Amino acid sequence: FQFKAFPSNSHILADVLAQHDINANDVDGVDLVRLFDTINSRIELLLDANHMLGHAYFMKVRNSQDIADVIAYKVVPLLEEYFFDDPQKIQLIFNSLNVNGELKENAVYYHEELSPDNLFSYTGEYDIEPVKHFFVNPNLTSESLVQIYQG
């Protein structure tokens, strides 16, 4: 028995896509290599290298909608498991917040704040704190994806 590690590798991803005549540095205007490497660098910084995304997640990508689907239906659920107690880190990974910590337009990972002031006319002696509800932008665009690796 032998264990051989296959770390994340954007070059393998680019080579596989090239076999299908897809330029991984320009998939409908999205630099998939840069996006992949940026997400993994942020995961490594916020968690560790053992939790980085594998290149296999993106090997079947043919257009920017495929990238958006991988992000929404594969990457986000994985990150929600990784950061179940701190979903704002997912916003950091996707560069969804501006320099003031406010949600960017076209962000990948949104949040809404549920405020007791908006939901109850009276709370009595209860001290109810606002709660943030996090979710994937239902209208991911190429611009949303580019925003991950560009400020």
Task: Kindly give the residue locations of the regions a language model identified.
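C-terminal regulatory/interaction module of P-loop NTP-utilizing enzymes
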Residues: F1-G151
